[in-house]
Structures are given as structure tokens and as C-alpha cells.
Amino acid sequence: MSEQGQLHAASVNANVIHTPSLADNNLRNIIHPRDPTCSRLQLPVGDKVGLTKTGVHYCRLPPGTTSTALHWHSHEDEWAYIVDAGRDCFLLTHDEGTNETKEVPLTTGDFLAFPAGTKVAHGFRTGKDSLVYLMGGSRESMDICHYPEIGQRLIIDRNGENWLVDEQHVKTQG
């Protein structure tokens, strides 16, 4: 192979992560700061290959686990692609209008989208089987992450500080 060909191959290889070969010890255990009973194993694959405007994470959810405190984003799109789902893996959704939380069964190959501002809080839960998925979304300079079951909002400023606000203290204007 020529020197130019070797450089191209090295460049392409720097942009490839072989997720099927990732062992659990390659993934970080992410414990949710708003609800420590929620956690997932995660690798920021988008960061690893140099993405700056889109976040993409490879995630494994062990049996008997909830991935995150149910949430929705005001300014950021969020999506998930189910790589491998066992028989008892679920999308959890919380509808603020009805204040109900529902379980939606997941299957391998499902694609889920949560457009910015859609007031459907979401997360994943497993039973006896594990769940493997890609999770991603836009990286806006400002976002508000709503946690309806906890009664809090996290105001995210990617260029500065974040603020956690209890819903009871939120006053809308306009």
C-alpha cells in the first residue's frame, strides 16, 4: 500500500468504532444526578470520532435497570436506535397532559425520535433482558431539560453554567 493509501486507511480507521467488540469495562457507568436509581453503561462514540454538533452515545442497559429520570428537551432533538432488545425492554413515556407514565415494548431495529419541545418525557427500562441502543441528539448552546416526575428543570448553558430550578419556583412571562 502506498504512503498516501496508508494515511487514508489510518484516517478512516480513526473514524470507526467497532461497537460489537466493546466490553462493559470500555463503557462508563452513568448514574443519573437527579435520580441515583437510574443508570446505564455508555460510551460517547460521537466524541470519540470528533463530532462537535451532534452527540451520539452507545449504551447498554443491564437487566432490571431504568436508564434515566424521565425527561424531555425544550431546544434539543433527541433520538434512539435499538440495536438489540430482549423480550422485556420498554420505552417509558410520561405525558404531562394526563400525568400518566406508560410502558411501550421495544424490539430490535426500532427508531425513536423526540423532537425539541415535544412534552413527552422518556427513558428506557429493562426486565430480565438487557438493551443495547444508540442515543443521540443535537447540541444546542442553550437547552432546558424538564423532569416532570421530579418536578425540576435543568437550564443548560453549554458556554457557561447550568441551573437546576424546582417547578414550584418557575414563573412564566408573556
Named regions from a protein language model:
Residues 66-67, 88, 110-113, 117-123:
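Histidine-centered metal-chelating micro-motifs
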Residues 95-116:
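Short acidic-glycine-tyrosine-enriched beta hairpin
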Residues 116-143:
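Ligand-binding loop in jelly-roll beta-barrel domains
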